[in-house]
Amino acid sequence: MPAEPLPATGAAVGIDLGVASLLTTSDGEHVANPRYLAASGATLLAAQRELAGKQRGSNRRRKARERVAAIHAKIRRQRLDHAHKTALAVVRGHDLIVHVALRVANMTRSASGTVDAPGTGVAQKSGLNRSILDAGWGIFLSLLANKAASAGRQLIAVHPANTSRTCPACGQCAAENRPSQAVFRCVACAHTGHADVVAARNILRAGLALQAARAA
């Protein structure tokens, strides 16, 4: 983490968090999401099955439990290291960084819901929850905030509404602008682009508008 303010770069960036890529920038850069939990899935599952088959209170069960814990600890270390390096690169390269305001804990609540409010699309939402947690959005945003503050960078969080549906060329906002998860195609002006890059550009624009409003 930078211990003192970094030299000015004159650059501003919007970042869109995702699961296909950890983040996509308004400059068109895609930062990989290593999916550490998924990558260790087979090893973890085998260790968990071995643990389940050991007799409670036995020495073998204790050792099996330690193996499961060690795998989880390795995944956490890998995820934290990647988040550190990614956040540091973003902070070093930009004076102004804009992201959407996300409540990751709320987004990853149990997909099954409650007795009074049962969940819908449980299997799909559970899969998305795992992907979000594996990507480490919360960890990354926390590190980004700390590093930005330490380096004297400005960090702005904006409302996510319509950032993925609005055309950066003409301003048209429509759900139909997203024919697929990865593609943006404006139904009004035919502007096309990668959907995540479009979202990041809209996030940056919203941040610059908020910055200007605060300065007025």
Language model features by range: what are they?
Residues 1-216:
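Positively charged, helix-rich recognition surfaces that bind polyanionic ligands
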